[in-house]
Swiss-Prot record:
GO biological process: translation
Alphabetized InterPro entries for the sequence: Ribosomal_bS16, Ribosomal_bS16_CS, Ribosomal_bS16_dom_sf
HAMAP family: Ribosomal_bS16 (MF_00385)
Pfam families: Ribosomal_S16 (PF00886)
Biased composition range(s): Low complexity: 111-122
Annotated region described as Disordered, given as residue ranges: 111-148
UniProt protein name: Small ribosomal subunit protein bS16
Stored Gene3D superfamilies: 3.30.1320.10
Molecular function via GO: structural constituent of ribosome
């Protein structure tokens, strides 16, 4: 039985995600797989590639043939060079910079707000409820009586 390491597409339209699977060469693209050994997300920047190196080495060792896209992915992760005994087994995989946590962002915003001068609101605050309206009317009547 010929075994291939290939990409099985998952994800939405225009948002592809792929599983790196080991399957019989005769099965469909998204057909039954023997084993899933990784993931590939090409739309992220940089592309996210996760490969179980130990399982990839096993399947390459027992004769599984990678398709061209999978071979390129294995070259990026360094698994292909390790299998062939070539230099450069560390790979050229780029990883995304870690995002700052929400707590760090909040603390930075507080520090920035503490340095800026505090300004009053540009619009006056509303007085709440009917009591405030009654007080306003009473003040207006007193001011009118005082003027008369």
């Amino acid at each position: 039985m010929a075994v291939k390491i290939k990409l099985a597409r998952i994800g939405k339209i225009r948002e592809p995600h792929y599983r790196i699977v080991v399957a019989d060469a005769r099965t469909r693209r998204n057909g039954r797989a023997i084993e899933t050994i990784g993931q590939y997300h090409p739309m992220e920047e940089p592309s996210r590639i996760e490969v179980d190196s130990e399982r990839a080495q096993y399947w390459l060792g027992v004769g599984a043939q990678p398709t061209e896209p999978v071979q390129n992915i294995l070259e990026i992760t360094g698994d292909w060079q390790k299998f062939k005994g070539l230099p450069g087994a560390e790979g050229t995989l780029k990883t995304a910079a870690p995002k700052p946590s929400k707590q760090e962002l909040f603390e930075a915003a507080l520090a920035a707000a503490g340095e800026e001068p505090v300004a009053e609101a540009t619009t006056p605050k509303k007085k709440g409820g009917k009591k405030a309206e009654a007080e306003d009317k009473a003040e207006e009547q007193k001011s009118e009586e005082g003027q008369a």
